[in-house]
Amino acid sequence: MNKIYSLVEDIYKVVATKEIPEDVDLYDEIDKFGEGCKSLMTKLFTEERNDGRKLRMSNIGRDDRYLWNAVNNSDVQEDMTPNTYVKFMYGHLIEEMLLFLTKLSGHEVTDEQKQCEVAGIVGHMDCKIDGVVTDVKSTSTFGFKKFKDGSLAFDDPFGYVAQIKGYAHSEGETKFGWLAMDKQNGHLTYLMYDSDDTQAPVHAKIGYDIEEHIERVKKLVEQPVWPEVCHEVVPDGKSGNQKLAVGCSYCQYKHVCWSGLRTFLYSSGPRYLTEVINEPKVQEVS
């Protein structure tokens, strides 16, 4: 059985050469991949969507006000747009494909969607690859860089570290990692952290006690008053206007936190302005 350190190299090799390891049954894995996609589509189109009104392992690492809103204000969150649903569906299919390629390249995949629980918070890990608790991610080119250079722990707006720390902790493990794909270019990388490695540059960001973190968050969301905003506004270039930070611009509670928010459609995408000194010369939407 191959080791996880050669995972990306082995996947690249198998797709380039079509040389399947002797101990891998190609047609069996293809059948399993097809069944996995079928199961995924069945789940997406038949199960009720989560209303977000509770703490889960997948959101436990998000910013404090986001979590407070998720528990106490979920009825005022923005509706998800159809294209966002398509984007998430596409991401799930990519993740299914990556696990297929992992198995096809001779690596062991176990514990898929295994339920985990820490301090009363429940979640389901993606899997273990070669015994390492692993999350599989499809990312933008920009997001991929953080997995490639190992800087994710320093810029983790979606709480990926806390999520996977919870899964690993429930298994009695300190090592965990992400198999990530740049969905625009097809590049792959594997990032592994070890929360017991005190010499690692990221240790100050990942070495915390996940049970203590969860208990703090559970108390926080029970408070009657919401916490401070997650991110302060930032200048919109040299216009004199102020806009939401990236972490807030993607949040479905931004209009709750920032009353009077105005949205302008730039060629690069929507820009959310909290203060307008100079009116942008682009379309505004309500």
Where are these predicted regions, by residue range?
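Metal-dependent nuclease catalytic cores that hydrolyze phosphodiester bonds in DNA/RNA
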Residues: M1-V133, S140-S151, F158, S286
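Residue-level preference for long, well-ordered alpha-helices that form the structural scaffold
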Residues: K87, D156-Y160, V202, I206-I210
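A structural signal for well-ordered alpha-helical scaffolds and beta->alpha junctions
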Residues: G91, E95, Y160-I164, I210, ...
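Metal-dependent nuclease catalytic cores in nucleic-acid-processing enzymes
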Residues: E96-S105, A153-K183
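Long, contiguous hydrophobic alpha-helical segments, chiefly transmembrane helices and signal peptides
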Residues: T134-V136, G166
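Residue-level recognition of conserved beta-strand positions in structured domain cores
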Residues: V136-S138, A180
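Metal-dependent nuclease catalytic regions and adjoining charged, substrate-binding loops involved
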Residues: G166, S170-S286
